[in-house]
Each structure stands twice: as structure tokens, then as C-alpha cells.
A protein has these predicted regions:
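PLP-dependent amino-acid enzyme catalytic core
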Residues: 1-498
Length: 498
């Protein structure tokens, strides 16, 4: 299978796309064509998560032999998750289930792809017989950073540098990054938001700095979901959801199910859409936004407009206005690299673009959008705990609030089972979780965690609890205009080590 840029005719192999991350023209890599539907439940029901991952991903990385892919998924998913099923799907009622994606090393859904991605990248690097070092440059709105740092920690031949908004993540998320272990990692806060960090990194990928670094022996790549090595492993868990629902008799063999995804950078919900294209019987696919509702407005109007106030919310991983993976969705909807290139240029120049009526009819046939206010989010957290004895993090609560409102309005078929994607452990956000339980947060987030645990009986995950006594190793904060300089300094450090 070949991969091409969303903006031009640039074409590469899957292994080349893995290492490069971003196309030379600034576009994102997509398959030259998506695989035809190939999923048959009867053939898949007996598979473990790692076996299912190998089967599904072999259709997207067909330049990796089957036995090699099985070994990679086995190494990635063995002993790295707290539950044997990797992604437990918990039935809450006849109407809906929760797909828990927070049982990995950093308590967030990013662990599912970032446990495997380092293995894929190292494999691709070996196959290309390229002796250069790889520097992973990553922007994070909270969860990707820690998951990427943990995934690439001490991986030979690979280094990772993460940029996060210094005032835009939760205290626990910040501790996870600032207290990261490893001899090949670097963490830097920025004065700005996630869009600033991601936008600057995209410019770096198209700059002379990338060329200079390559001449020094350091290649740039990305661990954000702009990289196919992040995106396609996420497809697997939507297939897993389907099989889990069948095993639990939540749906019948010929029934569909709806999926609600709390959405920031659009990678997670795009993976759900791709899963549907290859045969997962997803009915309604719902994109849930928080107060930064640029996507919800797009689905309503057909216009993507970032000329608006940016809100710092209690669901920081969704505090994004420029959703990078939306570019891929536009490509699939329009089928035109010229249209995508023009829209992305308009977004850069004016902060706004609109789709044609024909394209929007296709979009609305594939996906719906909704949003939840901070009040609706917190009420959802309280109500679900009171009714179902289930504690949600704020991102999952946004998804539930959108689902609940759409269900009341009749926008979701009442007879169709719905899966809400639970993207992070609630204990990563102790302040808002405590408030939703009627508790007053303590000044120290770890004291707040203990208070929540005492009330709910839910143990503090080891991965979070052990942070309290660990020293902070990364406290640098730079202006977004200084990010390129910080990257070049780290490149020089890497070269000095070698």
C-alpha cells in the first residue's frame, strides 16, 4: 500500500511515512485508497487484542510481513496494561456502554497507540537501513505528551521532545511530564496554547532547521496523530468494541452501534470513521466538543472558523481550535488534494474556510457534531456517578453530555446501543472530579486524590500515585517564538552524546 499527501501528489511507502511523519508539503499522509471492508466477526471473536491488532494493521502496513507484525503487537501489548482485555467495554444500561481506554501506562487512551508506535518506528528505521538518530517532536494538550514520553523512553536511536501549554494542562498531567524518567527525553512548557505548539512544530517540519538537523544526522518525526503510526493503531479498538458488544449480547450479529468520541485533534474519531469503512458496523458517529466548539459549529454550518475566543477548560485535551486530523477527513470527503490545499491555505491566511454544499452533504451523512458547556459537563459527571456509580473524567463527561442531549432530542436512534469512548482516568483531573462529587479540592492535588479515593473506594492508580514523591526534572518554559531555538539546542545535545 502506498501513502500520499493530502495536499499534493507526493507518494511514499508506509514505512517511509512512519519515519517522516509529515509530508514535505505540510500535508498528512493517507492511504492511496482505503482497504475494502474485510472484517467478519465470526473469524475475529476468538482473537486477543494483540492478535486483532496484528490482523487489522496488516491491511494498512502491508510492507510489514505478517509474522513481524504479530511480534510487534505482542511486544507492545504484553504486560503494559492493567487489564487483560486492554480496552474493557462496560455495559451501563441497555442503551449505552463505556469503552475504557485508560488502563495503560499513563492512564489515557493515547497509550493504546503509543505502546505500539515506537516498535513500528524502530522497525521502519531498521528496514530503511538508516543509521541516523530520530528526534520525535510532539505537541500535547495533555495526554499525548506523557504517553509518547513513556512509549519512547530509553528506545535506542530515538529521542523525544515534548512541548505543552504551561497553563493549559491539569496539575497531574503537568507532573506526569515534568517528572518523566529516561535519558532520551526532553519536556518544555510554552507560553501559549496547544494550537501555538502544534502550529509551530508544523512550520519546523517544513523549515531549514529540519534540513540542517538531517545533515547533522538527526531526522525529525512526530508522535502526534498526524503520524500514521499513531492513527491506524487507534482503528483497532473500535473493532474490539464491536466484538466486545457481541460477546456481551449488547448488540445482535446484524445490529449497528453508535459511537460518541470526545474530540480535540480529530485523530480518535477519524480512526472510528476508518474502522467503519473497513466493516465495523458503526451507525451514528458523533463528534463531541467542549466550549472550544469549532468542530460542532462546522458540522452545523459547513464553515470552519477559528476566529473566536479560545477557552481554557477543565477538559484540556479538547482545548484545540485547529484539529490537524480534520485535514484527512476533508480529503476523504472531497477526494481532492487541490481542495484540501486551498482550504488549508485559507485557514492559515484568514482562519476560515467553507465546504461546498455537495461536500457538506457527504460530511453530514458520515458524522454529527455536538458540544457541552462546562456546566453540562460537570452535571454529567455528577449525574452518572449518582445513577450508575461510575466516575468519569471531564472529557468522557463531555461525550456523555452530548450523547444525553442528542438522545433527548431524538437525534440518536433510541433502539441502537451507543458506546461512549472513555478517554482518560478520572484521577488525572482531581479538581473537577472532586467538585462533581460535592467535595472541596485541596491545594495539593495528591491530597485531593486521596479524598476522592476515600469517598468512592476507587484506588489511586500506581502510575499517578508514585509521581508525588518524584522530583521534577523538566521545568523550562519558553515563548512559542523560541521553540525552534530550543529544538536546535536539543539536536546539538544529541549530536554531542553520539
Amino acid at each position: 500500500m502506498k501513502y500520499r499527501s493530502t495536499r499534493s501528489s507526493e507518494t511514499v511507502t508506509a514505512l517511509e511515512a512512519l519515519v517522516k511523519g509529515l509530508a514535505s508539503d505540510g500535508g498528512l499522509y493517507v492511504p492511496s485508497e482505503l482497504p475494502a471492508p474485510f472484517l467478519a466477526a465470526d473469524d475475529l471473536m476468538h482473537l486477543s487484542y494483540e492478535e486483532l491488532a496484528a490482523y487489522v494493521l496488516s491491511h494498512f502496513f502491508n510492507d510489514i510481513p505478517e509474522e513481524d507484525m504479530k511480534r510487534l503487537t505482542h511486544d507492545a501489548y504484553t504486560g503494559t496494561f492493567e487489564t487483560p482485555e486492554i480496552v474493557p467495554v462496560k455495559t451501563m444500561s441497555e442503551s449505552f456502554s463505556m469503552a475504557e481506554m485508560f488502563h495503560g501506562r499513563t492512564c489515557a487512551f493515547k497509550d493504546l497507540a503509543l505502546s505500539l508506535f515506537p516498535y513500528l518506528l524502530v522497525y521502519a528505521k531498521k528496514q530503511q537501513k538508516d543509521g541516523k538518530e530520530v528526534l520525535i517532536l510532539t505537541a500535547t494538550s495533555g495526554d499525548t505528551g506523557k504517553a509518547a514520553l513513556e512509549g519512547f523512553r530509553d528506545v535506542p536511536g530515538v529521542h523525544i521532545m515534548v512541548f505543552y501549554p504551561s497553563h493549559g494542562v491539569s496539575p497531574l498531567q503537568q507532573d506526569q511530564m515534568q517528572k518523566q524518567l529516561g535519558n532520551n527525553v526532553k519536556v518544555v512548557g510554552i507560553e501559549g496554547n496547544f494550537d501555538d505548539a502544534q502550529g509551530t512544530l508544523k512550520k519546523v517540519f517544513g523549515s531549514e532547521l529540519r534540513e540542517r538537523s538531517a545533515e547533522k544526522g538527526v531526522l525529525f518525526s512526530s508522535a502526534n496523530s498526524i503520524n500514521i503510526g499513531r492513527l491506524f493503531p487507534q482503528v483497532v479498538y473500535y473493532v474490539w468494541m464491536w466484538l466486545s458488544l457481541l460477546k456481551q449480547n449488547s448488540i445482535g450479529p446484524k445490529e449497528t452501534f453508535n459511537v460518541v468520541v470526545p474530540t480535540g485533534n480529530f485523530g480518535n474519531i477519524l480512526a472510528a470513521w476508518i474502522a467503519k469503512q473497513i466493516g465495523t458496523p458503526i451507525g451514528e458517529l458523533i463528534c463531541a466538543s467542549n466550549e472550544n466548539k469549532v468542530l460542532a459549529d462546522f458540522f452545523k454550518t459547513g464553515t470552519y472558523d477559528i476566529n473566536r475566543d479560545f477557552h481554557l477548560t477543565e477538559a484540556p485535551s479538547m482545548d484545540i481550535l485547529i484539529s490537524s486530523n480534520f485535514e484527512r477527513f476533508l480529503y476523504f470527503m472531497t477526494g481532492s488534494k487541490e481542495t484540501v490545499a486551498a482550504d488549508m491555505q485559507a485557514l492559515k491566511d484568514t482562519g476560515i474556510y467553507s465546504l461546498s454544499k455537495e461536500a457538506m452533504e457527504k460530511v453530514t451523512g458520515e458524522m454529527k457534531g455536538g458540544w457541552a458547556s462546562p456546566k453540562a459537563m460537570e452535571e454529567a459527571m455528577t449525574n452518572v456517578y449518582d445513577k450508575y456509580d461510575y466516575l468519569m473524567d471531564p472529557h468522557t463527561a463531555v461525550a456523555y453530555a452530548v450523547y444525553d442531549e442528542m438522545k433527548r432530542k431524538g437525534e440518536i436512534p433510541r433502539h441502537t446501543h451507543t458506546v461512549i469512548v472513555s478517554t482518560a482516568h478520572p484521577y488525572k483531573f482531581p479538581g473537577i472530579v472532586a467538585k462533581s462529587l460535592g467535595l472541596t479540592p485541596k491545594d495539593d492535588p495528591y491530597d485531593t486524590l486521596r479524598m476522592i479515593a476515600e469517598k468512592t473506594g476507587i484506588a489511586i492508580p500506581r502510575q499517578l500515585g508514585e509521581l508525588e514523591s518524584r522530583e521534577k526534572g523538566f521545568t523550562d518554559v519558553v515563548d512559542r517564538t523560541e521553540m525552534a531555538e530550543a529544538i536546535e539546542r536539543y539536536v546539538d545535545e544529541i549530536c554531542e552524546k553520539d
